[in-house]
Amino acid sequence: MMRVSEEEAKRIAERLNYRWPDRTVVAVAQEYKSGKVLMVASMNKEAVIKTLTTGIVHYWSKSRKELWVKGATSGHVQVLEKFYYDCDADSVLLVVRQASLIACHEGYRSCFHYKVEEGGVKVEEPSYE
């Protein structure tokens, strides 16, 4: 689990460019072991600081307009292993250990289970690697 001091977390959070109208950055969660992209969400400054200081991933819910801990109710917690931000400082990559076999609220390992193929869309079977 990766954690930093509150002082360092605030310094990092200040470097980010919260350019969207709701003052968030794009957050991509990638599974530590497999490298699989699990989900994309949003983080505001508070979510970044809480994630970095606790080692447990927090997001900003655009629909509910509130901070949420991934897995607080479902048990599908994400533990932070690495934290990166991009060259524009408006997106972050969270390398996480998914505490369960599910990251998606639809019950799949990844939110990216709709595969567009010639002839239509295929829903991939759940993969619990």
From Swiss-Prot:
Chief localisation class: cytoplasm
Residues the record lists as binding Zn(2+): 87, 104, 111
Name of the protein in question: Phosphoribosyl-AMP cyclohydrolase
InterPro entries associated with the record: PRA-CH, PRib_AMP_CycHydrolase_dom, PRib_AMP_CycHydrolase_sf
Species for this entry: Ignicoccus hospitalis (strain KIN4/I / DSM 18386 / JCM 14125)
Keyword terms, alphabetized: Amino-acid biosynthesis, Cytoplasm, Histidine biosynthesis, Hydrolase, Magnesium, Metal-binding, Zinc
Cofactor note as given: Binds 1 Mg(2+) ion per subunit. Binds 1 zinc ion per subunit.
Listed EC numbers: 3.5.4.19
Known function: Catalyzes the hydrolysis of the adenine ring of phosphoribosyl-AMP.
Database matches in PANTHER family: HISTIDINE BIOSYNTHESIS BIFUNCTIONAL PROTEIN, HISTIDINE BIOSYNTHESIS BIFUNCTIONAL PROTEIN HIS7
Pathway(s) this gene product operates in, as recorded in its UniProt entry: Amino-acid biosynthesis; L-histidine biosynthesis; L-histidine from 5-phospho-alpha-D-ribose 1-diphosphate: step 3/9
Gene Ontology CC: one annotated term: cytoplasm
GO biological process: L-histidine biosynthetic process
Subcellular location: Cytoplasm
Gene assigned in the entry: hisI
Oligomer status and interactors: Homodimer.
Cofactor: Mg(2+); Zn(2+)
Coiled-coil segments: none
Reactions the enzyme catalyzes: 1-(5-phospho-beta-D-ribosyl)-5'-AMP + H2O = 1-(5-phospho-beta-D-ribosyl)-5-[(5-phospho-beta-D-ribosylamino)methylideneamino]imidazole-4-carboxamide
